C-alpha cells in the first residue's frame, strides 16, 4: 500500500512540475525571439532579422558563454535579451533610440552589471535545479504565439532628457563649482531631482545663501540666491541641444545647481555625488516637498516593492530610484535616476530615465525572476531603493495637478509635441481606437482648451497663440503630456 501511494505521489509531482531543461541561447535564437516581441509589443511592428544588429554581448566569466545580448534596431530602437531560458526573455527595450554601451552613464552601467550578475549565477546553477526556472514567456516567443500589438498599454509620464553636463552640446552644469579649472558635473542625484522639480514646476524660487562642498572636503562658496529669484520654468526645455537658447540653458543649469547644493552634493570633476537619504530629507527641509518614504528593496517582498512603485506611477508621480554596490570599483558610490513609466499589461516592465541626455531611457525589467534561489550567493534586490510621496507641498498649485485632471475615455497613444516650447501652435501626433477628447490644462489645474481626436493615426494642431507663457498639461485617455508656451 505504501509503495502504491509513493508511486501516485511521484506521478503527481512529475505532472505538476514538467522537467524541461533550461538552456542557453545563441545570438540568432535570441534575435528571433526579440523580433517577435518587438512586432507585438512596440511601434516597431515591421521588424525583420535585417533590422536587428548585434551591438554588444555580455559574457559569463565562469563559462565564457554569452549571458545577455544587445540588438540595436536600424530604424532606432534597441532590445536586450537574456541568453538563457531560465530568465525572463526581455531585459530592456526601446522603440525610438539605439543604445551605445560606450556612452552609457554610470547608473545604467551599474544596473546592467547587477542584472548580468544575476543571469550568470542562474546559468551557473545546477542543471537539475535550473529546470524549474524555465520561463514560460520563452515558449510564446520561440513559437511565435503572440497576437495583436500591445503598444497602447504603455504610459510614460516625463519627457525630460536632462544630463549632468558631461556630454557634448549640453550645458546643464554652467553654474557648477570649478575644481582645478574643471567645471564639475551636476551629479546623478541632483539631475534626477531637478528633472522631478521641472516636471512639477516646483520650487517656485531659490532662497538664501547655500554652500557646496568638494569631494576633498574643501568648502566652496557659491553665489547668493535671492528670494526673488523665481525659476522661469516656461523657458526651460525637456532637452538641451545645439539650438537651445542660452537663456534656457542658464535657467536649467541654475535649477540643477541650486538643487545640487541644497541637497548636499559633493562636487568633483570626475563625478559629483550625494547620499540619497540625506538629499530626500533636504528636499523637504529646503523646498517643502512632502517627506518622501524610502523603501529598500531587500527589506520587503518583491511584489510589495513593485506595487508601491506602480501605485506611485499610477498617481502620475515620477519616482526617484537609487542603488549602490556593496564593494569597491566605480559603482561603489550611490547612483540615482527616475522611474517615470510603466506598462499596464506587464507588472515587471518600467520606464527608466537615467539622467544622461536620454541615453538608455527605455523600459527595463524590474522583476526579480524568483531570485534569490536558495544556495545562490547573489541577490538582485540588494542595494536598491525607491522614494514614494516626493511631491510639492499641499499649498502648491503644482501638487497633484496630474491626479486632479479627469480621465478621458478610449485607448490613446500620444507622441511628443512639436515644436516644444511653442509660441503660436503645437502639433501633437496620436493614435486612438475611437473618437476621443484631448483636454489641455494650465499648471494650476484650469482647463484652457479641448480638441477632438478622430479615430486612427494622425496629428492634431493646438492653437496656443492666446495662451500666456507657462507650462501646460494635456490628457487623452490614460496618457499625459506637457508642453511649454513662450
Regions found by a protein language model. Give the residues of each.
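Active-site-adjacent structural segments surrounding the nucleophilic cysteine of cysteine proteases
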Residues: 90-272
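C-terminal outer-membrane/trafficking sorting elements
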Residues: 18-19, 407-418, 422-486
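Active-site-adjacent substructure of cysteine-protease-like catalytic cores
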Residues: 56-75, 286-353
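Exposed beta-strand-loop-beta-strand "reactive/processing" segments of non-cytosolic proteins
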Residues: 46-85, 94
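Residue-level detector of functionally pivotal "anchor" positions at catalytic/ligand-binding pockets or at interdomain
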Residues: 377-418, 432-433, 446
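Bacterial Sec-dependent N-terminal signal peptides
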Residues: 1-27, 283
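Short, non-transmembrane alpha-helical segments in secretory-pathway proteins
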Residues: 23-59
Amino acid at each position: 500500500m505504501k509503495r502504491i501511494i509513493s508511486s501516485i505521489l511521484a506521478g503527481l509531482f512529475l505532472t505538476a512540475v514538467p522537467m524541461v531543461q533550461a538552456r542557453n541561447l545563441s545570438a540568432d535564437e535570441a534575435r528571433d525571439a526579440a523580433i517577435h516581441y518587438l512586432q507585438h509589443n512596440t511601434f516597431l511592428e515591421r521588424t525583420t532579422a535585417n533590422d536587428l544588429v548585434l551591438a554588444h554581448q555580455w559574457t559569463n566569466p565562469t563559462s565564457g558563454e554569452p549571458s545577455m545580448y544587445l540588438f540595436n534596431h536600424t530604424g532606432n530602437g534597441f532590445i536586450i535579451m537574456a541568453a538563457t531560458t531560465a530568465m525572463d526573455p526581455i531585459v530592456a527595450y526601446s522603440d525610438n533610440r539605439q543604445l551605445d554601451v560606450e556612452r552609457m552613464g554610470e547608473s545604467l552601467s551599474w544596473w546592467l552589471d547587477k542584472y548580468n550578475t544575476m543571469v550568470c549565477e542562474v546559468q551557473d546553477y545546477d542543471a537539475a535545479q535550473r529546470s524549474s526556472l524555465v520561463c514560460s514567456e520563452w515558449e510564446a516567443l520561440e513559437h511565435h504565439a503572440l497576437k495583436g500589438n500591445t503598444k497602447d498599454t504603455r504610459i510614460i509620464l516625463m519627457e525630460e532628457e536632462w544630463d549632468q553636463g558631461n556630454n557634448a552640446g549640453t550645458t546643464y552644469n554652467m553654474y557648477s563649482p570649478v575644481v582645478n579649472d574643471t567645471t564639475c558635473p551636476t551629479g546623478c542625484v541632483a539631475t534626477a531631482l531637478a528633472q522631478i522639480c521641472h516636471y512639477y514646476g516646483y520650487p517656485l524660487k531659490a532662497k538664501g545663501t547655500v554652500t557646496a562642498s568638494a569631494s576633498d572636503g574643501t568648502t566652496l562658496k557659491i553665489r547668493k540666491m535671492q528670494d526673488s529669484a523665481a525659476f522661469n520654468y516656461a523657458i526651460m526645455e525637456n532637452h538641451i541641444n545645439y539650438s537651445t537658447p542660452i537663456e534656457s540653458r542658464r535657467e536649467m543649469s541654475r535649477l540643477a545647481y541650486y538643487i545640487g547644493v541644497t541637497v548636499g552634493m559633493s562636487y568633483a570633476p570626475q563625478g559629483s555625488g550625494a547620499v540619497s537619504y540625506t538629499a530626500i530629507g533636504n528636499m523637504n527641509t529646503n523646498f517643502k516637498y512632502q517627506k518622501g518614504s524610502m523603501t529598500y528593496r531587500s527589506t520587503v517582498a518583491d511584489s510589495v516593492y513593485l506595487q508601491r512603485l506602480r501605485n506611485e506611477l499610477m498617481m502620475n508621480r515620477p519616482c526617484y530610484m537609487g542603488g549602490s554596490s556593496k564593494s569597491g570599483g566605480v559603482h561603489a558610490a550611490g547612483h540615482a535616476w527616475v522611474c517615470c513609466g510603466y506598462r499596464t499589461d506587464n507588472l515587471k516592465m518600467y520606464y527608466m530615465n537615467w539622467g544622461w541626455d536620454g541615453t538608455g531611457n527605455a523600459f527595463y525589467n524590474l522583476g526579480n525572476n524568483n531570485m534569490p534561489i536558495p544556495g545562490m550567493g547573489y541577490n538582485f534586490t540588494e542595494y536598491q531603493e525607491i522614494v514614494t510621496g516626493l511631491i510639492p507641498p499641499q499649498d502648491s498649485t503644482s501638487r497633484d495637478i496630474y491626479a486632479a485632471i479627469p480621465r478621458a475615455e478610449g485607448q490613446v497613444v500620444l507622441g511628443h509635441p512639436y515644436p516644444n516650447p511653442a509660441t503660436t501652435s503645437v502639433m501633437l501626433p496620436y493614435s486612438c481606437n475611437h473618437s476621443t477628447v484631448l483636454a489641455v490644462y494650465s499648471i494650476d489645474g484650469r482647463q484652457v482648451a479641448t480638441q477632438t481626436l478622430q479615430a486612427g493615426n494622425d496629428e492634431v494642431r493646438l492653437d496656443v497663440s492666446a495662451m500666456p507663457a507657462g507650462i501646460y498639461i494635456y490628457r487623452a485617455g490614460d496618457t499625459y503630456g506637457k508642453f511649454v508656451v513662450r
